[in-house]
């Protein structure tokens, strides 16, 4: 199976399965000289990890990361950084009854047809459990970007189902289990999740990511445009079904006179483009949105087929998120950080800045 690596200079390769022994990643291209410890990674891992809220999956993983290589006396050496997280709370028996069935909305069918074999325990490699290593790698990128350029990457839940959550404050984002910036919406979100858990259903969500203080010049025309790489990275997250950059799909209803970001000697008058022009960052904040589909693993009975192509009913047991978008906030931040880190190093290599 290919496709486990992202980046050209700052390269992140992940490995491991949902119910395997461990998850891991190798990071190549990390510059030397950054002070780094596992504590730097643990903050974001704790934000993502399961079992921390009654509104997410109750699988209880500590997600304690171990740095295997690339750091000496608390400082990066420039060599490959190896990271590993042990899986502690697998419950593979939850999947024994459906091991020969294809779960609707999951990768079971496509993995089986392509590879002829699949790990049915929690989806194996296709599980969002894999994203723990992305968050770990992204934490390293976030720290380096902030120190070197002042870049700050933050995200929040901007919608869950038909509940819109307009931005209010970054402080509020870390004060509730939904990563919602609007405290007036938290009760509605709680009630929605309670209702979904009672009915055994799930719901989709929208995450907004903002990267501040990004310098002018990140991105490479034509096929390595910054917006293309960001979209690629965000769409690689499990359950992601759409990405918007800047005004996104609302540009369909705009006129050119409305959409163009006019310039003055003091800077841009607007930011409809979301901080990227011609595939290159323009110095404005980068605005992105990601849409996540509802969790496919639900307790409601549904129709599917088995390995013999026979029609069967399926009810999925186990511990699953009623809304995967909640824990996607630190994952989305990590993917944006990995892309910006890669483009920072590429920018330096080409432009010597």
UniProtKB/Swiss-Prot annotation:
What's the protein called, per UniProt? Chorismate synthase
The UniProt similarity line reads: Belongs to the chorismate synthase family.
Residues engaged in binding FMN: 125-127, 238-239, 278, 293-297, 319
Its pathway? Metabolic intermediate biosynthesis; chorismate biosynthesis; chorismate from D-erythrose 4-phosphate and phosphoenolpyruvate: step 7/7
Alphabetical UniProt keywords: Amino-acid biosynthesis, Aromatic amino acid biosynthesis, FAD, Flavoprotein, FMN, Lyase, NADP
Q: Output the Gene Ontology cellular-component terms.
A: cytosol
Known partners and oligomeric status: Homotetramer.
Q: Which gene codes for it?
A: aroC
GO molecular function, a single term: FMN binding
Summarize the protein's role: This reaction introduces a second double bond into the aromatic ring system.
Give the top-level enzyme category.
lyase
Residues given in the record as NADP(+) binding sites: 48, 54
InterPro entries annotated for this entry?
Chorismate_synth, Chorismate_synth_AroC_sf, Chorismate_synthase_CS
The organism's superkingdom is given as Bacteria
Substrates-to-products reaction catalysed: 5-O-(1-carboxyvinyl)-3-phosphoshikimate = chorismate + phosphate
- Give the co-factor note: Reduced FMN (FMNH(2)).
Task: Give the required cofactors.
Answer: FMNH2
EC number, as in UniProt: 4.2.3.5
């Amino acid at each position: 199976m290919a496709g486990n690596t992202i980046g050209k200079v700052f390269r992140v390769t992940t490995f491991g399965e949902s119910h395997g022994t461990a998850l891991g990643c190798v990071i190549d291209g990390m510059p030397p000289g950054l002070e780094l410890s596992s504590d730097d990674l643990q903050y974001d891992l704790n934000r993502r990890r399961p079992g921390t809220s009654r509104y997410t999956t109750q699988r209880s993983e500590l997600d304690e990361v171990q740095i295997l290589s690339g750091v000496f006396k608390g400082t990066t050496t420039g060599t490959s950084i190896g990271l590993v997280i042990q899986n502690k709370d697998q419950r593979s028996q939850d999947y024994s009854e459906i091991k020969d069935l294809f779960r609707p909305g999951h990768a079971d069918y496509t993995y089986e047809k392509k590879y002829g074999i699949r790990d049915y325990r929690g989806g194996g490699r296709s599980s969002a459990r894999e994203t723990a290593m992305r968050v770990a790698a992204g934490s390293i990128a976030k720290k380096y970007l902030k120190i070197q350029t002042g870049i700050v990457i933050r995200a929040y839940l901007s919608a869950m189902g038909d509940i819109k959550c307009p931005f209010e404050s970054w402080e509020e984002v870390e004060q509730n289990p939904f990563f919602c910036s609007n405290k007036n919406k938290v009760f509605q979100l709680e009630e929605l999740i309670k209702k979904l858990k009672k009915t055994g259903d799930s719901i989709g969500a929208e995450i907004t990511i903002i990267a501040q203080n990004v310098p002018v010049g990140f991105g490479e025309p034509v096929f390595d445009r910054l917006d293309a790489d960001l979209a690629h990275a965000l769409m690689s997250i499990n359950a992601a079904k759409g990405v918007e950059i800047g005004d996104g799909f609302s540009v369909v209803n705009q006129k050119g006179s409305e959409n163009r970001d006019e310039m003055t000697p003091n800077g841009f008058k607007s930011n409809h483009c979301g901080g990227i022009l011609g595939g290159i960052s323009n110095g404005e904040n980068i605005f992105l949105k990601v849409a996540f589909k509802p969790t496919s693993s639900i307790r409601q009975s549904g129709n599917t087929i088995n390995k013999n192509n026979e029609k069967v009913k399926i009810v999925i047991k186990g511990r699953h998120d009623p809304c995967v978008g909640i824990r996607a906030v630190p994952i989305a931040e990590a993917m944006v950080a990995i892309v910006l880190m890669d483009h920072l190093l590429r920018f330096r290599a080409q432009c010597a800045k």
